Structure formats: C-alpha cells, structure tokens
Amino acid sequence: ALNAIMPTFLLLAFGYFLKHKNFVSSEFLKQTNTLTFKFFLPFLLFNNIYKTEITEAIDGMTFTIAVGSLLLLFAVLCVVVPRVVREPKQRGVIIQGIFRSNYVIFGVSLVTNVFGAEEAAAASILSAVLVPMYNVLAVIALTVFTGGGKVSLKKTLKSIATNPLIIAALLGVFASIIKLRFPAFLETSLRDVSRLATPLALIVLGGDFSFRKLKGNMRIAGVTVFIKLVVIPLVFLPIAVLAGSRGPSLLALALAWETPVAVSSYIMAQQAGADGELAGQLVVLSAVCCIPTVFLMIFILQSMALL
C-alpha cells in the first residue's frame, strides 16, 4: 500500500516545491497542464487500452456498479443536500464535491502502481464512462441548485464530445476490438509519451496547491471531504466486494469513490455563479486528505486478499 501511494505523494510534493521555490512559474504550470490534458493523458489512456482484450479487462458488473452507484449517490445528494445546506450557492458545489472525482489522474496512476501498466486497462476504460457522467451531472447540480449563473448544457455536451480523454479512451476501445497493432518503433514512441502523463499531471497539481486556499469554510469543507473520502467508500465498497469484484476492477471502482475532487469543478462552480471559494477549498482539502485514506483503503483490501 505504501509503495502504491508514496509515488503519488512525492510527485505532488515535488510540484509544490518547484512552484513555491520559484523554479517554475504559474504560466509554465498552466501550459504544462494544457499539454498534459490534450496530449499526454490521452496517449496514456489509449496506450493502456488498445493492446488489451476488452472483455477480459473489465466486465459488465464493474460498469453496472460504477454507473449505478454514481447515479444513486447523485439522486440521494440532490434530495439531502438542499435540506441541510442553507446557502443556495453552496448546494451545487457540495453535491459535485462529493460525487465528482479526479479519476483519470489518480485512479489510472494508482491502479498502475499496484498492478502494473498491463492491468491498468480496467481503470482506463472506466474513465470513458465516468468522465462524461461527472460533467453532465455537475452541470445539472450547479444549474438546478445554485440559483446563480447558468452553465450551458449544450456547451458541456459539446465539450464532452471533443474531450481528448474521452476520444482517446473510445479510440483505444475501437483499436482493441479490431486488434490494431503498430510497428515496434511507433509502439515504443507511444509508450514513452504516455509515461510522461502521470508524473507531469501530479507535478502540476502539486504546483497549483496553496495552503492559503484552505482558509474559511473549513467546517463545511471538512464534512464534505469526510463524506466523500470515508463515508461513500464505506457504503459502496462492501457492495462491490459482495458482488464479486476483485483485483484491478475492484481497485478501479474503489478509486472512483475515493479520489480527490476534480480540479475542473472549481472552474465550473465559478461559471455557474456558485461558491467558487468553497469549490477550490474542496479540491485542495480532498487532495491532502486522500493520501492517508487511499493508503488505508489499499492496505485493508490487500490485507483481505481482495487485490
């Protein structure tokens, strides 16, 4: 478990060190983040999927649990949160903060750390389903419950259709189905480029981290992150285990519930006229708190011989 989580923590810490010691600028981090999102992460997803036998990598049960748990969680949050949160601008932010995860960066990398790149296809394929669902549900939550500005569903659907991560994952599935193979030199280049994705993504995330963003709203942010990282996995993980999920598929499911709040949730909250400050705090606090919670989760699952 320590070997799985420490590389992630060290890369985040390295990014924080580089930025706060002025070795890199905010502009550099912004440009690197764009490169990573548009090129390196798509290469990683495609490379993880296209050489995999899809039917062996992930089964219908995993998809059913992932989609079913997300929709159930969203429905419950839409009923409960408006009843217990008084501030309208915080309701949509809290809803998306609990269900929405930074799955592509943390989920795929941690499955790779535990099982190796060959077994990371389950997490990569699952991202093709979860990423568009996260975006659509976030738009609904922010539009219906915020009462401020509006997030365009049409624009969001367009962004989903042109999302490099989703396109790469779907192309990987198609390439796997037709059993596409590249010449050795292209496979080597594809592998080398894909290896840049996770380190760069985590370094950029660490560089963007600021303890100052944690000031204010700590009580409500703390409760939200606790529900996300502790309560939700405790509810859904036993269901996945009882359903027979094991190994890479189980870890991929677990990380769909356990990983930090997606960075893009902060931007969407601002666009919707919601509490952008709280959204940013949820991103930062969940990134800090996920290190021990993910470690404990992996340790417990390994101790029970489920991974």
Can you say where each PLM-predicted feature lies in the sequence?
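Alpha-helical transmembrane segments of multi-pass small-molecule/ion transporters
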Residues: A1-L307
